Amino acid sequence: MKILIVEDDTLLLQGLILAAQTEGYACDSVTTARMAEQSLEAGHYSLVVLDLGLPDEDGLHFLARIRQKKYTLPVLILTARDTLTDKIAGLDVGADDYLVKPFALEELHARIRALLRRHNNQGESELIVGNLTLNMGRRQVWMGGEELILTPKEYALLSRLMLKAGSPVHREILYNDIYNWDNEPSTNTLEVHIHNLRDKVGKARIRTVRGFGYMLVANEEN
């Protein structure tokens, strides 16, 4: 799962990124509403953590706009605005939860988990490709009824490939899914994790699309 963090306070942003990674989530971070909207258009996210005091636009206006565009992913507002009126306004415009700064990281983690569970229960919580089943709420993967033990990076790669099963995924998209896990990623980071993932799901199942990226197929015979 991948989280989009929209926060213009650099110090807090770094802390939020670290907190997300510690919990096993990949994340992208932006500092303006415009950049956030561009990220939503270009990527696939499971949740947005949104500050309201953005430099280019009020976060409530941004939230209202993305809801009008039919983005249904859960949004957690993270803000210093602490009045009842502020909270009601945020929830009414489309937020799924509202957390006031300062906050405890444990509470933030719990609220994110609750939002993801709720969202997954409302829609498709499982991805199924051949005999592979990925439960997005539990972050578990089974192959032929047997649970696979994956690292967080392997899980991030497999979930992306399963979402686009049968279609090639560009290596840059896959690289971005795991980039945040490494402070100084090497040039072969992606290849190493693809190799390890192939050992677990079947070598011929993840195919190299020369000059582009990788593609997951339903079984090794396809």
Curated annotation (Swiss-Prot):
PROSITE patterns: OMPR_PHOB (PS51755), RESPONSE_REGULATORY (PS50110). Disulfide bonds: none annotated. Its main location: cytoplasm. Residues 124-218 bind DNA. It is found in: Cytoplasm. The modification 4-aspartylphosphate is found at D51. NCBIfam families: PRK10643.1 (NF007928). This is Transcriptional regulatory protein BasR. The gene is basR.
